[in-house]
Amino acid sequence: MASNNTASIAQARKLVEQLKMEANIDRIKVSKAAADLMAYCEAHAKEDPLLTPVPASENPFREKKFFCAIL
């Protein structure tokens, strides 16, 4: 039973240390974080291949148009 108390105390100390670390984290409002994320996305939109597709001539994954005919 003494080892159970020791383990419980060690676990509680670990939890307190974790909570102290989390309390010291600088936080920002969600609205500010969302605005910053949107600004970043808009600033880098031209570099995003999902928004501005890669030209077919430069796309290494384009479908090859080979036709196979068995005679």
Swiss-Prot record:
G proteins are composed of 3 units, alpha, beta and gamma. In this context, interacts with GNB2. The heterodimer formed by GNB1 and GNG2 interacts with ARHGEF5. The heterodimer formed by GNB1 and GNG2 interacts with GRK2. Forms complexes with TAS2R14 and G-proteins; these complexes play a role in the perception of bitterness. Component of the TAS2R14-GNAI1 complex, consisting of TAS2R14, GNAI1, GNB1 and GNG2. Component of the TAS2R14-GNAT3 complex, consisting of TAS2R14, GNAT3, GNB1 and GNG2. Component of the TAS2R14-GNAS2 complex, consisting of TAS2R14, GNAS2, GNB1 and GNG2. It comes from Homo sapiens. It is found in: Cell membrane. Keywords: Acetylation, Cell membrane, Host-virus interaction, Lipoprotein, Membrane, Methylation, Prenylation, Transducer. One of its GO terms (biological process) is cellular response to catecholamine stimulus. Guanine nucleotide-binding proteins (G proteins) are involved as a modulator or transducer in various transmembrane signaling systems. The beta and gamma chains are required for the GTPase activity, for replacement of GDP by GTP, and for G protein-effector interaction. SUPFAM superfamilies: Transducin (heterotrimeric G protein), gamma chain. Belongs to the G protein gamma family. The modification N-acetylalanine is found at A2. This is Guanine nucleotide-binding protein G(I)/G(S)/G(O) subunit gamma-2. Residues 69-71 form a propeptide. GO terms for cellular component: extracellular exosome; heterotrimeric G-protein complex; membrane; plasma membrane; synapse. Expressed in fetal tissues, including testis, adrenal gland, brain, white blood cells and brain. The modification Cysteine methyl ester is found at C68. A lipid is attached at C68 (S-geranylgeranyl cysteine).
